[in-house]
């Protein structure tokens, strides 16, 4: 105890105590942690083999892994084992595959024209197997055909199918021939002498205005219809009078109400 007391008293009077303590802390911080086994090796103890607890761990790791790899995919059926009751071994397929022609058929539904209290209905079935874009193109084509009926008579058109599609042409109509019964001592009027009113398509007709400030209305069938087919498609016929044909054209062009207010029709 006396020696320990003397050491403590000496350290208290030691002027470089703080520096020595700092150097000791720095050395301890740089010192790597080592296992007892490694410390024994540094001390010069000759250890040719690792301790038993290290060997046991290494042996278990090296033996378990190859065993798992060797057992994968090496199932060998036991030929001498008893067969399972109810199991029938089927013969293996040993024939060669042959090419077989496959034909995809579809039931085409024909267009149907129906009549009911609301009028006539035409039903067109959509072709099978169309993609979304093809379906849209098909619908637009049908719509275009329907809208074209405003400008010509579809029933009078010719239909031609080609490799690229369909061609519809306006049929050139021949003038309608009607029998005229002559009347004695009378002179036929211009409308009676004309076999087809469309022959007067370039002849203008004048309607007088109801007000003096307006100019007379002069118009012809050629200005109201682009062709005889268009004239026929909206209800015209060759036996109409010239005036009736002009009035039909005004109604077709939606000008009749305006003309009726301003002119004597």
From Swiss-Prot:
Subcellular location(s) of the protein: Virion; Host cytoplasm
Claim: Chaperone is one of the keywords in the record: yes
Main location: virion
Segments for region (Interaction with N(0)): 1-60
Domain of life assignment: Viruses
Site, as annotated: Involved in oligomerization: 138, 141
Region (Hinge): 171-193
Post-translational modification note: Phosphorylated in the N-terminus by host CK2. Phosphorylation of the phosphoprotein is required for the transcriptional function of the P-L complex.
Stretches for region Disordered: 28-69
Modified sites of kind Phosphothreonine: 62
Comp. bias intervals (Acidic residues): 58-69
Record-listed Phosphotyrosine modification sites: 14
Annotated region (Oligomerization), positions in chain: 109-170
GO molecular function ontology, one term from the record: RNA-directed RNA polymerase activity
Chain residue ranges for the region called Interaction with the Nucleoprotein-RNA and template-binding: 245-265
Region Interaction with the L polymerase: start-end pairs: 49-105
Function: Nonenzymatic cofactor regulating the function and conformation of the RNA polymerase and part of the transcription and replication complex. Binds the viral ribonucleocapsid and positions the L polymerase on the template. Acts as a chaperone for newly synthesized free N protein, so-called N(0). Plays a role in virion assembly.
Notes concerning its domains: The N-terminus is disordered and is involved in binding N(0). The region of interaction with the L polymerase is necessary for transcription. The hinge region is highly variable. The central domain is involved in oligomerization. The C-terminus is basic and essential for binding the N-RNA template.
Assembly and binders: Homodimer. Interacts with the L polymerase; the association of P and L forms the polymerase complex and positions P optimally for encapsidation of newly synthesized genomes with the nucleoprotein. Interacts (via N-terminus) with N(0). Interacts (via C-terminus) with N in ribonucleocapsid (via C-terminus); this interaction allows to package the L polymerase in the virion and positions the polymerase on the template, since P acts as a bridge between N and L.
Protein name per the record: Phosphoprotein
């Amino acid at each position: 105890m006396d020696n320990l007391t003397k050491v403590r008293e000496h350290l208290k009077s030691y002027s470089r105590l703080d520096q020595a303590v700092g150097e000791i802390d720095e050395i301890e911080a740089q010192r790597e942690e080592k296992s007892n086994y490694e410390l024994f090796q540094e001390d010069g103890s000759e250890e040719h083999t690792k301790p038993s607890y290290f060997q046991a761990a290494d042996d278990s790791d090296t033996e378990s892994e190859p065993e798992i790899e060797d057992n994968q995919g090496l199932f060998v059926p036991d030929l001498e084992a008893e067969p399972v009751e109810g199991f029938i071994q089927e013969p293996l397929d040993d024939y060669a595959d042959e090419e077989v022609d496959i034909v995809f058929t579809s039931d085409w539904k024909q267009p149907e024209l129906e009549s009911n209290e609301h009028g006539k209905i035409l039903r067109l079935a959509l072709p099978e197997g169309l993609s979304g874009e093809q379906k849209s193109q098909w619908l637009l084509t049908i719509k275009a055909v329907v809208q074209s009926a405003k400008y010509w008579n579809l029933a009078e058109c010719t239909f031609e199918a080609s490799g690229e599609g369909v061609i519809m042409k306006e049929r050139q109509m021949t003038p309608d021939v009607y029998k005229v019964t002559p009347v004695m001592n009378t002179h036929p009027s211009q409308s009676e002498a004309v076999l087809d009113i469309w022959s007067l398509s370039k002849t203008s007709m004048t309607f007088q205005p109801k007000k003096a400030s307006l100019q007379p209305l002069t118009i012809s069938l050629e200005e109201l219809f682009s062709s005889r087919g268009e004239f026929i498609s909206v209800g015209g016929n060759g036996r109409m009078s010239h005036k009736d044909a002009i009035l039909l054209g005004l109604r077709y062009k939606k000008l009749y109400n305006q003309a009726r207010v301003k002119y004597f029709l």
